[in-house]
């Protein structure tokens, strides 16, 4: 399956923990489940025009939820923590700190 850079990066994670990590030049994104670290690195460098130093990924299994007698499951997702090279920053997040 051919993934474009915009297919790989789904959305940013905006939580208290991820905002605190921005002080250390680390940014968190929800990414495509099939994307590997090399693809994620290339996508972030292409979309945000920055230099990536490190990529850490985590896979999460969706929780089983129940509403009345109906049982369902939330979607699985993959999260990537991107460490940028010294002196780089993503402008999209600058106003949020």
Swiss-Prot record:
GO function terms (MF aspect): rRNA binding; structural constituent of ribosome
InterPro entries attached to this UniProt entry: Nucleotide-bd_a/b_plait_sf (IPR012677), Ribosomal_uL23-like (IPR013025), Ribosomal_uL23/eL15/eS24_sf (IPR012678), Ribosomal_uL23_CS (IPR001014)
Entry keyword annotation includes Glycosyltransferase: no
Stretches that traverse the bilayer: none
Pfam families: Ribosomal_L23
A GO CC term attached to the entry: ribonucleoprotein complex
Keywords for this protein: Ribonucleoprotein, Ribosomal protein, RNA-binding, rRNA-binding
Superkingdom of origin: Bacteria
Biological process annotations from GO: translation
Role noted for this protein: One of the early assembly proteins it binds 23S rRNA. One of the proteins that surrounds the polypeptide exit tunnel on the outside of the ribosome. Forms the main docking site for trigger factor binding to the ribosome.
Record text on subunit structure and interactions: Part of the 50S ribosomal subunit. Contacts protein L29, and trigger factor when it is bound to the ribosome.
Family, as annotated: Belongs to the universal ribosomal protein uL23 family.
PANTHER family assigned: 60S RIBOSOMAL PROTEIN L23A
Protein name: Large ribosomal subunit protein uL23
